[in-house]
């Protein structure tokens, strides 16, 4: 539970630091005497760096340990937040937002690497679901927190002071209690790390100290640092086509958050910043619920599919490899449908200024779908590359942030050309197309597995899926 709590807290600041900025955009535009389109560039730049940075930092975590990289990420984030709270020029704000994103962005991918260290495929979905749910709570509720801070202190600087204080408390807690989980350093949790920065106070407690037996046979062999490792995974045909719909779902959610902060303050709603913030609250709660539910569903459907596979091929000498890809991606059907429905309703209701209830309900559908997709795809990527869990999930982070940056950058022009209803209908149409790509990948993988039958264990081979023994000693 301690591990889940720490990873959730660290990830919360990563997801919250983007939407917490949205309610401040009108205030910042006036303060820096610029235009909304220019101010929006700081949002785009943040998302770009949030997507690119993990491909480097997460790779470091896979090779040199999770704990040191996480602590360094939080420290960089805190320094950037303090600096932003003191800046008085726009260009410096934009640059520091990039530093902020590069600092905290990798922790989401590194958290997934931890899941690969401590969980088996059978229970990985539940672990990822809980952690991702609390982490994505920041994406859903960040706007409300930002609005409340501006309303209370009447200053956009309060947002970054709040982030610095919250992340600072998390850094202290993580320094003392975050354990190292990399199997290249601690094996199955029975080995004391060599370096001080990799040691947490937990290993000196009697409950955990008695588990230390220095079983070096559980250590994984060190590998050379490969800067291109995440990109090699990213550009695999199966992975790339799978990430496309997940990235678009997140981008659609980001665009939704932007439109809420922009259009609810205008006629005919005329909401205050605080009232707009409350509109974000249901999304945050729905993210948490959806991620936990999808995590439990992933675990259940994995066990169901594996039992069905074992029953079917119990007496067979030659059998296809277990299709874990299909077991993970099948659960995305319902979230995909909810996203399409939510986007169409949200766009046209906001376009025709319908009752706020319709906007809230549709935004909940969008948030639930996006968070469910992220949890399912994170689990799938760790299943496929458990020894490079951070690097593999940084691919999802790269895809979703780059797509979010793209659509945030062109959003104003899209709305000017097609209107709100047309813009979100187009997004729904793109979701349908990319969801069909995912269906194609599932069918293609299933066909390939049937055509390449072999004597195997009920998991895929090492270059596709590597089942990792459960590391119970690392889960306080």
Model-derived segments and their meaning:
Residues 89-97, 109, 159-160, 242, ...:
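Short hydrophobic/alpha-helical segments at membrane-entry points of transmembrane helices
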Residues 15, 44-47, 69, 82-85, ...:
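C-terminal transmembrane bundle
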Residues 1-17, 26, 30, 468-473:
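Cytosolic juxtamembrane N-terminal segment immediately preceding the first transmembrane helix
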Residues 1, 124-126, 151-240, 292-312, ...:
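Central mid-sequence intracellular linker of multi-pass
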Residues 17, 32-33, 56, 64-65, ...:
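Helix-breaking motifs and short loop linkers at transmembrane-helix boundaries and internal kinks
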Residues 51-91:
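Conserved MFS/SLC helix-loop-helix module at the cytosolic interface between two early adjacent transmembrane helices
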């Amino acid at each position: 539970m301690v591990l889940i709590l720490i990873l959730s807290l660290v990830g919360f600041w990563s997801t919250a630091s983007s939407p917490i900025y949205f309610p401040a955009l009108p205030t910042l535009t006036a303060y820096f005497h610029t235009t909304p389109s220019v101010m929006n560039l700081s949002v785009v730049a943040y998302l770009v760096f949030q997507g690119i940075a993990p491909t480097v930092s997460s790779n470091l975590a896979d090779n040199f340990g999770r704990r040191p990289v996480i602590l360094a990420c939080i420290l960089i984030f805190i320094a950037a937040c303090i600096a932003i709270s003191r800046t008085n020029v726009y260009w410096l704000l934009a640059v520091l937002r990039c530093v902020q994103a590069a600092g905290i962005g990798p922790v989401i991918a590194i958290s997934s690497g931890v899941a690969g260290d401590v969980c088996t495929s059978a229970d990985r979905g539940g672990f990822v679901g809980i952690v991702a749910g609390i982490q994505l709570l920041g994406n859903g509720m960040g706007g409300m927190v930002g609005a409340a801070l501006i309303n209370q202190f009447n200053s956009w600087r309060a947002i970054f002071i709040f982030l610095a204080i919250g992340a600072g408390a998390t850094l202290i807690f993580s320094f003392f209690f975050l354990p190292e989980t990399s199997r290249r350093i601690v094996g199955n949790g029975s080995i004391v790390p060599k370096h001080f920065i990799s040691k947490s106070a937990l290993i000196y407690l009697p409950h955990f100290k008695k588990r230390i037996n220095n079983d070096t046979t559980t250590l994984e062999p060190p590998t050379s640092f490969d800067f291109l490792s995440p990109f090699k995974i990213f550009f695999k045909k199966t992975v790339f086509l799978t990430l496309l719909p997940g990235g678009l779902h997140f981008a659609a959610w980001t665009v939704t958050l932007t439109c809420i902060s922009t259009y609810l303050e205008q006629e005919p709603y005329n909401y205050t910043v605080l009232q707009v913030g409350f509109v974000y609250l249901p999304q945050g709660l729905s993210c948490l619920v959806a991620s936990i539910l999808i995590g439990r569903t992933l675990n259940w459907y994995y066990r169901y599919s594996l039992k069905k596979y074992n029953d079917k091929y119990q007496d067979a000498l030659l059998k296809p490899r277990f299709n874990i890809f299909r077991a993970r991606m099948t659960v995305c059907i319902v979230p995909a449908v909810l996203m399409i429905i939510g986007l169409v309703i949200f766009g046209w209701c906001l376009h025709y200024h319908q009752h706020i209830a319709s906007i809230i309900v549709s935004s909940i559908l969008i948030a639930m779908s996006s968070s469910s997709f992220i949890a399912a795809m994170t689990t799938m990527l760790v299943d496929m590359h458990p020894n490079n869990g951070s690097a593999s999930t940084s691919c999802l982070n790269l895809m979703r942030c780059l797509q979010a940056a793209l659509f945030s950058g062109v959003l104003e022009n899209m709305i000017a050309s097609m209107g709100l209803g047309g813009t979100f209908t187009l997004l729904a149409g793109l979701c349908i197309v990319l969801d069909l790509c995912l269906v194609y990948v599932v069918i293609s993988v299933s066909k390939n597995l049937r055509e390449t039958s072999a004597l195997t264990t009920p998991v895929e081979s090492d270059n596709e899926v590597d089942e990792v023994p459960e590391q119970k000693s690392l889960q306080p």
